Amino acid sequence: MKKNVVVIFGGDSSEHDVSCLSATTVIKNMDTEKYNVILVGITKEGKWLLVDSVKDIEDGSWREGEVKAFISPDTTTRSLVILAEGTYKLQKVDVIFPVLHGMNGEDGTVQGLFELSKIPYVGCGVLASAVSMDKVYTKIIVDHIGIDQAKFVHVRESDFEHLDEAMDRVEKEIPYPIFVKPSCAGSSKGVSKAENRKELEAALYEAVKHDRNILCEETIVGREVECAVLGDRTQVKSTCVGEILAAQEAAFYDFDAKYNNAESKTVVDPDMPEESKQKIREDAEAILKAVDGFGLSRVDFFLEESGRVVFNEINTLPGFTSISMYPMLWKACGLDIPELIDILIDQAMTRYR
């Protein structure tokens, strides 16, 4: 019997468009012999809509839809509520596959709704999602388990009342250049690189537009590498290493470099010492366990010329676009996207048994 799988995409975050791209990849690779795929898109304004087909996602016409659909928190129904023509119906749901990036998608908020509904869902739970979305608290946890990472200083929105003092504190702990990041934002939105105090001030004002908590971080010079992980209650598996080769004109691998610059490249299983690859995989698995992760995640690192592996960040709902590293790394391990989707759905179902 087919499982009713609700794929939720879009969202009112800065990564709305990337989410739509990821969703098309996921939907096109779902086995329709196994799954009855139901599409729900969330507009940038926060409207939940029933979507007819993947074609509507590709051409953007789904945003003009009129049939509203949302997950009910009523545990006795475990359903999607569909509102149309003044009436409603309940569509039974077996599993939810969220393809939501950034705020309100991978920060634990929508996962909380899924938990209330008691419907199985793909990916990390509330705790792992919330912690991993917050760069400051992720670094606190990673520091606790003894994995190398860049030096950092936490600046709060309230510190702007005495900004000179806050900048003094940052400069005391971290040498220039300094990366300034919103603590809770994805795809490098609001991230700046400051070479001096004037640029630091501007970077802080830019970051606070995106979040009230800001991470000021030491610049690490090294290769940008990533590892895909897949975990459940019993084990965590990791892939070979991937490397990001940002376009030469990009100051760092920001949103435009990731998604809009054809010069940026990804390399699967790049040339590097085997001990470095093993260290990256071990650290990636350890970090997923430390944040209580489940299902899919991608863990990013820097590899310094000295051979030191430095943690950068964890992404609990990594991109699934045609150029995304997560599915590419699993494919290199012999796991194609349809099989990967099957595993993620099976894991979600098993978690609730």
What feature does the model see in each segment?
Residues 168, 269-271, 290-291, 303-305, ...:
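Peripheral (often C-terminal) accessory segments that flank ATP-dependent C-N-forming ligase machineries
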